[in-house]
Amino acid sequence: MATVTSESEFQHMLRVCNTNLDGRRKVPYALTGIKGCGRRYAYLVCKRAGIDVNKRAGLMTPAEIEKIVDILNNPLNYKIPVWFLNRQKDNKDGKDSQLIANAVETRLREDIEALKKMRAHRGLRHYWGLRVRGQHTKTTGRRGRTVGVSRTKGA
């Protein structure tokens, strides 16, 4: 059953974790706009926060938004299982965490730089601009690379 709300209470755009979210979408699907938060994780966050999954994101109160942000930043405090997190047994500190927003891109870039620095096979493939995950490269992936041809003097 839909409730009628005044236009002043509804937020068309929400700012959560440095990301603009569409207030017209339902809460879990709006949360998927945050990098590092997929559909299953968004549903779990809504369940832990006690927010109705059929509610529109623009109708959330500031307290509910704060609760969601706290769960996104500290998932282990809300009994979200370790296997659900996107960063398990971190190479630097060995901790389990959920990376969201800009931290995902930053950590990925740091991981690739570390692979390059230690001269691992994957790091070298990244450095050379080749496929990393074992794909064949004889016939595919030729765009962008050119081989110079030298002309012969004569005729």
Curated annotation (Swiss-Prot):
SUPFAM superfamilies: S13-like H2TH domain. GO terms for molecular function: rRNA binding; structural constituent of ribosome. Pfam families: Ribosomal_S13. It comes from the Eukaryota. Residues 135-145 have a biased composition (Basic residues). GO terms for biological process: translation. Its main location: cytoplasm. Transmembrane segments: none annotated. Belongs to the universal ribosomal protein uS13 family. Component of the small ribosomal subunit. PANTHER family: 30S RIBOSOMAL PROTEIN S13/40S RIBOSOMAL PROTEIN S18, SMALL RIBOSOMAL SUBUNIT PROTEIN US13. This is Small ribosomal subunit protein uS13. The lineage of its organism: Eukaryota, Amoebozoa, Evosea, Archamoebae, Mastigamoebida.
